[in-house]
Amino acid sequence: MDRQAQFRAREALIFDVAERLLLESGEMGMTLDTLALELDLAKGTLYKHFQSKDELYLLLIIRNEQALLDMVRDNQGDFPARLVFYMLHHLHHPERTVLFHQIEERLSAGAQGLGVLFSQLYRIRKQRLRLIIGITDNYLKAQQCSMSVRDYLAAIWSMTQGAASMLNSSFYQRYLGSRDTFRVAVIDQMLALPQQFKQPTNPAA
């Protein structure tokens, strides 16, 4: 394995372990000292891959966003299959969904020196949205639905974020019952939503 391949493999391992520690300990509980100890690496080695903990967090968010883009590109299924994949990506890991959103909002509001990485994040997200908008538009037209693409995608995002927050809540999850049936119910609601906006058919003359 050449040095570049070794560097990439080590970086992938660092990101895997960092994400696990972040989800286990929370944003304040995960330290670079703990990460270095877990990986059995010198702390200076970590700084070859990122310059600060905030930069590491944003790189993890970028990696997650890239995974979603790859899913859209690689998944040749119909729209319902893509919607299910997207929602389960978030709802099977609600703690990641909630935490990454909170961290992104915090960093975008005041962190310094992350402009290049935020540009990269937004570029990846825009690429995914360009693909999704076309797919969604075709689906809504096939369903003879009057709902706009914007409104449908916003509803999916809102429902996914809200459901993830409930699944991640120490209070609300006590009242959810089966987490699996809750996920199915949420997804079914989003699949059924276009039927509520069916365009009226013109009566035969």
Give residue ranges: language-model regions.
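Short hydrophobic/aromatic patch on the recognition helix
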Residues: 39-50
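Alpha-helical DNA-contacting segments of helix-turn-helix folds
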Residues: 56-64
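N-terminal intrinsically disordered/low-complexity leader segments
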Residues: 1-9, 143, 198-205
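Hydrophobic alpha-helical connector segments
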Residues: 59, 70-96, 149-156
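Hydrophobic/aromatic-rich alpha-helical bundle segments in the mid-to-C-terminal region
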Residues: 140-187, 201-205
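Basic, helix-initiating cap at the start of DNA-binding domains
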Residues: 1-25, 29-38, 55
